[in-house]
Design a protein with these regions (language model features):
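Glycine-rich phosphate-binding loop and adjoining helix at the ATP-binding site
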Residues: 103-132, 136-202
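Gly/Thr-rich phosphate-binding beta-strand-loop-beta motif of the actin/hexokinase/Hsp70
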Residues: 66-103, 204-207
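Extreme N-terminal segment that seeds HTH/winged-HTH DNA-binding domains in transcriptional regulators
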Residues: 1-31
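Residue-level recognition of short loop/turn positions
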Residues: 50, 97, 154-155
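Conserved phosphate-binding catalytic cores of ATP/NTP-utilizing and phosphoryl-transfer enzymes
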Residues: 55-77, 184-205
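N-terminal helix-turn-helix
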Residues: 23-55
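Short helix-capping/turn signature of helix-turn-helix
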Residues: 20-21, 97, 198
Length: 207
């Protein structure tokens, strides 16, 4: 691993730690991630300057300067989720704290041709109308699309879906509807991922 890759990995590790907590401190990050204080200070400074994290208060002091508490900036980036069913289209926008910013459910019958793709693209555009094109490119991390059935994520393929009456069906037409990365998932897997994955080491999702 090159020096640049190591720096990126360290920064990602710090961001992942912060994003899964209401608040934390530089001392806590150093201790929990086994990183030196100079490394933590330099990374936190950079993350604050970029607006990825924010100062959200101060810890009680037993003497000396009060330590600043820091947390993720929820509005730094967003992700969009789309749920496709036989008769409906669901859309949701979440921030970096996994909070739902906006949601909508529309009656839309699934059909396996390009007209459906155009309709999904139109509804998604209207759903994101509070963001201009530049904001969408900068702030939208990607789109996750949930589909009932057996999905091959790498090939962007529905192997089989009883609900949508599909078999070996390419999802590339849906991917082309967006200018950001698109990820496909089985509906049950997507629902499980939407839960707080950091609360439990092992979990079972029943639908």
């Amino acid at each position: 691993m090159s020096g640049l890759e190591k720096k990126f990995a360290t920064k990602s590790k710090i961001v992942n730690y912060i994003i899964n907590r209401e608040s934390t401190s530089k001392v806590e990050i150093s201790k929990e991630l086994n990183l030196s204080m100079p490394t933590v200070l330099s990374n936190v400074k950079d993350l604050l300057e970029k607006g990825i994290i924010i100062e959200i208060g101060e810890y009680e002091s037993t003497g000396g300067r009060k330590a600043k508490s820091i947390g993720i900036n929820p509005s730094y980036r967003y992700a969009m989720g789309i749920v496709i069913t036989a008769n409906h289209l669901g859309m949701v926008l979440v921030n970096l704290k996994y909070e739902i910013v906006k949601s909508e459910r529309i009656r839309l019958k699934f059909v396996s041709d390009m007209s459906y793709c155009s309709q999904v693209a139109d509804f998604a555009t209207k759903f994101l109308d509070h963001m201009n094109d530049a904001e969408q490119k900068e702030k939208l991390l990607g789109v996750g699309i949930s589909i009932p059935g057996i999905i091959n994520q790498e090939q962007k393929l529905v192997i089989k879906s009883h609900a949508l009456k599909l078999e070996n069906y390419s999802l590339s037409f849906l991917e082309q509807a967006f200018s950001v990365p698109v990820y496909f998932s089985n509906d049950a897997n997507a629902a499980m991922m939407a839960e707080d994955m950091n609360t439990y080491q092992n979990a079972i999702y029943l639908s």
